[in-house]
Amino acid sequence: MPETNDVISHLYYDLNDKIDSLEQRLAGAEDIYYSNSYVERLKALGSDVQYSTYPGGSISGTAFTDNTLYLTSIFIPKTSIISGIGYIISTQGSYTADEYNGIGLYSYDSTNEKLVLIASTTNDGDIWKAAANAYATKDFTTPITVNSGIYYVGLLYNNSAQVTAPILMVSAGQTTITPLINTIGLTTAKLVGGSVNTMNNLPSEILNTSITSVTIGAILYLY
């Protein structure tokens, strides 16, 4: 009959093995959590896209308005290095650029209910003149390491003269019901997406109360 100490020792090591196994499984769980099958297919085929706001379904277009910052939220489930943003222009813009044209990435400060700029692209007057219906990308000035959490991608358009407004490819389903889905279960100061008017540059901070709910549903890619 085994000695009591031997039994206790065996149970101890067996328990440790189970804990180690569980920790390894949990460590991989964050990779499983992000379940956008479209993105997983892109990655499996060799794309550098890590996350996307595109939920699938039909697509449409939303025309940009001068001096308007468009904000679209995305949840990032694990620590990631983001180098830039991909987007698709369905109608190429024809305009004379002024002020700032580009993209910013904002973290969310839930304590103070505000967005904080953490990365941005260089000012590029031609960014919204990308070829129509083609995938375009824009790098941040420096790749940014982000932790798990909610983030907002901001798209800013400025012009001094315009022939044709750039039209961004968007999710048609989201565009239709965004005013509703922007606020489900949330306080009025929190939105899944929206816009801020009279913006000549990317603000370093944006209060929740400054954001207006709009129907956009931007299709964006984080790589």
Question: Which residues make up each language-model segment?
Answer:
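A short beta-turn/strand-edge loop motif at beta-sheet boundaries
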Residues: G93-A97, V146, T209-T212
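Aromatic- and Gly/Pro-enriched, solvent-exposed loop/edge beta-strand patches characteristic
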Residues: A97-L180
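A short beta-strand element within beta-rich, extracytoplasmic domains
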Residues: S80-G93, V153
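Short, surface-exposed beta-strand/loop patches at domain edges
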Residues: L156-Y223
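Extracellular beta-rich ligand/substrate-recognition surface
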Residues: G57-T68, I127-N133
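N-terminal low-complexity, intrinsically disordered "leader/linker" segments enriched in small/polar
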Residues: M1-T53, N67, S73
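Extended extracellular/luminal ectodomain segments enriched in beta-structured repeat modules
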Residues: D66-L69, I76-G86
